[in-house]
Swiss-Prot record:
It is found in: Nucleus, Gem; Nucleus, Cajal body; Cytoplasm; Cytoplasmic granule. It comes from the Eukaryota. This is Survival motor neuron protein. PANTHER family: SURVIVAL MOTOR NEURON PROTEIN (PTHR39267:SF1), SURVIVAL MOTOR NEURON-LIKE PROTEIN 1 (PTHR39267). Residues 273-287 are annotated as: Required for interaction with SYNCRIP. Its main location: nucleus. The modification Phosphoserine is found at residues 23, 26. One of its GO terms (cellular component) is axon. Residues 157-180 have a biased composition (Polar residues). Residues 1-27, 52-83, 148-216 are annotated as: Disordered.
């Protein structure tokens, strides 16, 4: 207790003691084994190189058979030589024009035997172009190409026409019927035409022909919706104009105006015919 010394700690309470086991300076990432394995692999590889085991494997790609470009070149030269012997100046041929890649008929203007090229003049165009002799085609190739192009164009046109017919069939059908149905109310709503013979109207005698003007033709069908229905019989009072809301546009206003003109002309003609009928009836009565 005395002497200022502390009490000794019991053994069970010690958690860490420096200097026992691993120290703070020890390297826990020791790669000695990895270095030894690497050195062993390198040594075995060097040993195999000395014995010649790997040299044979490395020499195998060198012993593979070489390609034969020379033979191919020989065959190409042979074909080119044959083409040079086949074509001559003035011959008809077919050539691919470099601008569009299409085949056109041409005539050989000159041949360079060293370069294995030639100059062709396209028939009907006059364009001159240098071509390889091996690329020249027979005139029949141009005809076959034209036939193929015509066939392709016909197929495209037929496809377009088929698409158009399908689109028309998919569109709202029976448009003429719809137009007729819209125009039908004119026939039922029109006032009856003036009588062509004596019908008891006015003092005219029976059988007196009516020489008044015929009624005007009905307006276009798109204005039929503006004509209100009224019962058949002699017109007494013109039908009232449709009630136009404030939101009508120019087309609606134009339709209302045309309807008014039509009805005004019709009733004016009817009135003039009626008066003419009365006048002729009076003249025949006095005679």
């Amino acid at each position: 207790m005395g002497g200022g010394g502390g009490l000794p700690e019991p053994e069970d309470s010690v958690l860490f003691r420096r200097g026992t086991g691993q120290s703070d300076d020890s390297d826990i990432w020791d790669d000695t084994a990895l270095i030894k394995a690497y050195d062993k692999a390198v040594a075995s590889f060097k040993h195999a190189l000395k014995n010649g085991d790997i040299s044979e494997a490395s020499d195998k790609p060198k012993s593979t058979p070489k390609r034969k470009p020379a033979k191919k070149n020989k065959s190409q030269k042979k074909n080119a030589t044959t083409a040079l012997k086949q074509w001559k100046v003035g011959d008809k041929c077919s050539a691919v024009w470099s601008e569009d890649g299409c085949i056109y008929p041409a005539t050989i203007a000159s041949i360079d035997f060293k370069r294995e090229t030639c100059v062709v003049v396209y028939t009907g165009y006059g364009n001159r172009e240098e071509q390889n002799v091996s690329d020249l085609l027979s005139p029949a190739c141009e005809v076959a190409n034209n036939v193929e192009q015509d066939t392709q164009e016909n197929e495209n046109e037929s496809q377009i026409s088929t698409d158009e017919s399908e689109n028309s069939s998919r569109s709202p059908g029976n448009k003429p019927n719809n137009i007729k149905s819209k125009a039908a109310p004119w026939n039922s709503f029109l006032p009856p035409p003036p009588p062509m013979s004596g019908s008891g109207l006015g003092p005219g005698k029976p059988g007196v022909k009516f020489s008044g003007p015929p009624p005007p033709p009905p307006p276009p069908h798109f204005l039929s919706c503006w004509l209100p229905p009224f019962p058949s019989g002699p017109p007494i009072i013109p039908p009232p104009p449709p009630i136009c809301p404030d939101s009508l546009d120019d087309a609606d206003a134009l339709g209302s105006m045309l309807i008014s003109w039509y009805m005004s002309g019709y009733h004016t003609g009817y009135y003039m015919g009626f008066k003419q009928n009365q006048k002729e009836g009076r003249c025949s009565h006095f005679n």
